[in-house]
Amino acid sequence: MNGPPDRVDFKPMGPHHGGSFRPMGFAYDDGFRPMGPNGGVGGEGTRSIVGARYNYPAKYPPSESPDRRRFIGKAMESDYSVRPTTPPVQQPLSGQKRGYPISDHGSFTGTDVSDRSSTVKLFVGSVPRTATEEEIRPYFEQHGNVLEVALIKDKRTGQQQGCCFVKYATSKDADRAIRALHNQITLPGGTGPVQVRYADGERERIGTLEFKLFVGSLNKQATEKEVEEIFLQFGHVEDVYLMRDEYRQSRGCGFVKYSSKETAMAAIDGLNGTYTMRGCNQPLIVRFAEPKRPKPGESREMAPPVGLGSGPRFQASGPRPTSNFGDSSGDVSHTNPWRPATSRNVGPPSNTGIRGAGSDFSPKPGQATLPSNQGGPLGGYGVPPLNPLPVPGVSSSATLQQQNRAAGQHITPLKKPLHSPQGLPLPLRPQTNFPGAQAPLQNPYAYSSQLPTSQLPPQQNISRATAPQTPLNINLRPTTVSSATVQFPPRSQQQPLQKMQHPPSELAQLLSQQTQSLQATFQSSQQAISQLQQQVQSMQQPNQNLPLSQNGRAGKQQWAGSAIPRVASTTGSTPVSYVQTAAPAVSQSVGSVKCTWTEHTSPDGFKYYYNGLTGESKWEKPEEMIVFEREQQKQQQHQEKPTIQQSQTQLQPLQQQPQQVQQQYQGQQLQQPFYSSLYPTPGASHNTQYPSLPVGQNSQFPMSGIGQNAQDYARTHIPVGAASMNDISRTQQSRQSPQELMWKNKA
């Protein structure tokens, strides 16, 4: 408001003074007083506004004419109009971003209102972070009137972002600067030429259209200059931008801008699918790129790199970055850098959790897995076994394990996940199921690291941690008895074993316990013991000179109550001569049952049955083999209970009295031959003598010197029935020999 507090700006208008309002009628007796340019009183006369008559006193102060105190309304006439007013004094707006010099008459000295709409903002990239406005402005002032140079800085740190905006007064100046500076000059301290282009939205604002083309299948070694030369033949190229990754390497695609649609169409017709760059094997892909507005505040040089193919100004959207140019269909889509393809039929073994490769595979529903008796280190990665073809009388799982151990594949027991194999899908479990069978071991000489070929509910208390605890047996002579001779104790007797398997500190006890669980395997082998006794005299002389360490005695001491010693607890050397008589014992223990069918596992993890005499293979279990297994099971059921009870009760005393057990072995003439009979040497035959070889010190590879020939031995094993055997009744009669030894050791 102008004037004192008791006054207002409006005054009665005089008839002779021009002002802001045109007279509205012919009665000049009252009205508004015109305002002068400075906001004061316009003149002495008045002009009345003709309108409705008001009967209340006027609220306006009197003018120079003392008798005028109120408005007098007249009848409104139809010639009402507004005369242009004198321009008021313009004041700078409070919300104005940048001030411009203002003259005394309220006009801009630089660019007036009409000129401001034609100002053009350019984006400049590849600006050194140390550059200042004074260093940048001279390069652009050479090509037009530069109104402003604005360096882009980080809001938090205040550091420059390596780009800036330059505002020109006219679009002609901006176009001239783009043609002269884009990819042409390098600012002091810069690493490459600057990129000069219209800022986002500037072309739309000033009404200048651009025609942008997406170009694919470019040579990744090509530069912007080389790409521009290809497109220059169709018209003036305003901009060339190559998409680059976070290492500033070209991705083989980019964008080319034309100023007219005709030149852009000509480039598409002349290059798309017809022109091939040097060093490329595919023609160029040229098409229109649909523009996409970027997020506010982001530009091509400011967007952070996102994965491969994310050059400046490209943001991650979904599986790949999307450029602000809008066309990303030509971009190479990203994939996970490492996602191993899973095979449908060959999956990780269900009983192993191999983490040596840094991954933890687990069987999934609908994904076939190798059965538990093929849980070698190669099973989880789809690698076929070295000998996928079935060999007569040789378990394929044993062959796998022999080859894996010979190749130096070492699986640490502590890395096995302690999960019960009971959780396997039923169709994927081993398919040898007997009535009342409770053993996961059915091949006493050729079992793998996991051992079971028959898994029933009573076995759920045996975790995978026990699987790699029988390493030496991997190198044993494989026989055609793939099942029916080994049984684990009943479920009630496996409860104590379960509790001792989890603590890693009790691995030694785990090894011994699993040994005891295998004792029933060789109790039915009466011919094996008798053969040992016959060969004692012939082998005793050379064996007397062979050293046996105390740990080796501990392994033999375990023989006093079982048939399989725990070599994992031996760190000494065991001569190979101890292993010479296993083949005759094995053949004779098997020959009493006339079964020529053996169970094997294919490389895909499926069970099949092979006839060693006829060479026939079947997927279904033969009736002959079922009868064979039942007969063996009946024999084992009579032998199982007393043997396991004795083995569990004497476990601790056996480990504490190696010297006493050694003497007892000498008294029973079972010292060296009995120990060796169950560890046949690869390639061993009935009457072959071998020089002594030390057993490996690593408990996981107790017979590494022998295991190297496991593959060759598997092809030369002794078939079923190679050694004759007599009636089964002698087996029952000779059972008391090892049992008496166990009771003596306990005492």
Curated annotation (Swiss-Prot):
<protein>
    <recommendedName>
        <fullName>Flowering time control protein FCA</fullName>
    </recommendedName>
</protein>
<keyword id="KW-0221">Differentiation</keyword>
<feature type="compositionally biased region" description="Polar residues">
    <location>
        <begin position="395"/>
        <end position="406"/>
    </location>
</feature>
<keyword id="KW-0539">Nucleus</keyword>
<feature type="compositionally biased region" description="Low complexity">
    <location>
        <begin position="642"/>
        <end position="673"/>
    </location>
</feature>
<feature type="compositionally biased region" description="Polar residues">
    <location>
        <begin position="320"/>
        <end position="353"/>
    </location>
</feature>
<feature type="compositionally biased region" description="Basic and acidic residues">
    <location>
        <begin position="630"/>
        <end position="641"/>
    </location>
</feature>
<dbReference type="InterPro" id="IPR001202">
    <property type="entry name" value="WW_dom"/>
</dbReference>
<feature type="region of interest" description="Disordered">
    <location>
        <begin position="80"/>
        <end position="101"/>
    </location>
</feature>
<feature type="domain" description="WW">
    <location>
        <begin position="591"/>
        <end position="624"/>
    </location>
</feature>
<dbReference type="GO" id="GO:0005634">
    <property type="term" value="C:nucleus"/>
</dbReference>
<dbReference type="GO" id="GO:0003723">
    <property type="term" value="F:RNA binding"/>
</dbReference>
<comment type="function">
    <text>Plays a major role in the promotion of the transition of the vegetative meristem to reproductive development. Plays a role in the regulation of flowering time in the autonomous flowering pathway by decreasing FLOWERING LOCUS C mRNA levels. Required for RNA-mediated chromatin silencing of a range of loci in the genome. Cotranscriptionally recognizes aberrant RNA and marks it for silencing. Controls alternative cleavage and polyadenylation on pre-mRNAs and antisense RNAs. Acts redundantly with FPA to prevent the expression of distally polyadenylated antisense RNAs at the FLC locus.</text>
</comment>
<dbReference type="InterPro" id="IPR036020">
    <property type="entry name" value="WW_dom_sf"/>
</dbReference>
<feature type="compositionally biased region" description="Basic and acidic residues">
    <location>
        <begin position="291"/>
        <end position="301"/>
    </location>
</feature>
<dbReference type="InterPro" id="IPR035979">
    <property type="entry name" value="RBD_domain_sf"/>
</dbReference>
<keyword id="KW-0217">Developmental protein</keyword>
<dbReference type="InterPro" id="IPR000504">
    <property type="entry name" value="RRM_dom"/>
</dbReference>
<feature type="domain" description="RRM 2">
    <location>
        <begin position="211"/>
        <end position="291"/>
    </location>
</feature>
<feature type="compositionally biased region" description="Polar residues">
    <location>
        <begin position="726"/>
        <end position="739"/>
    </location>
</feature>
<feature type="region of interest" description="Disordered">
    <location>
        <begin position="291"/>
        <end position="503"/>
    </location>
</feature>
<dbReference type="GO" id="GO:0030154">
    <property type="term" value="P:cell differentiation"/>
</dbReference>
<feature type="domain" description="RRM 1">
    <location>
        <begin position="120"/>
        <end position="201"/>
    </location>
</feature>
<feature type="compositionally biased region" description="Low complexity">
    <location>
        <begin position="448"/>
        <end position="460"/>
    </location>
</feature>
<feature type="region of interest" description="Disordered">
    <location>
        <begin position="722"/>
        <end position="747"/>
    </location>
</feature>
<feature type="compositionally biased region" description="Polar residues">
    <location>
        <begin position="674"/>
        <end position="707"/>
    </location>
</feature>
<keyword id="KW-0694">RNA-binding</keyword>
<comment type="subunit">
    <text>Interacts (via C-terminus) with SWI3B and (via WW domain) with FY (via PPLPP motifs).</text>
</comment>
<dbReference type="Pfam" id="PF00076">
    <property type="entry name" value="RRM_1"/>
</dbReference>
<dbReference type="InterPro" id="IPR047193">
    <property type="entry name" value="RRM1_FCA"/>
</dbReference>
<feature type="region of interest" description="Disordered">
    <location>
        <begin position="630"/>
        <end position="707"/>
    </location>
</feature>
<feature type="compositionally biased region" description="Polar residues">
    <location>
        <begin position="461"/>
        <end position="498"/>
    </location>
</feature>
<dbReference type="InterPro" id="IPR012677">
    <property type="entry name" value="Nucleotide-bd_a/b_plait_sf"/>
</dbReference>
<dbReference type="GO" id="GO:0009908">
    <property type="term" value="P:flower development"/>
</dbReference>
<keyword id="KW-0287">Flowering</keyword>
<keyword id="KW-0677">Repeat</keyword>
<dbReference type="Pfam" id="PF00397">
    <property type="entry name" value="WW"/>
</dbReference>
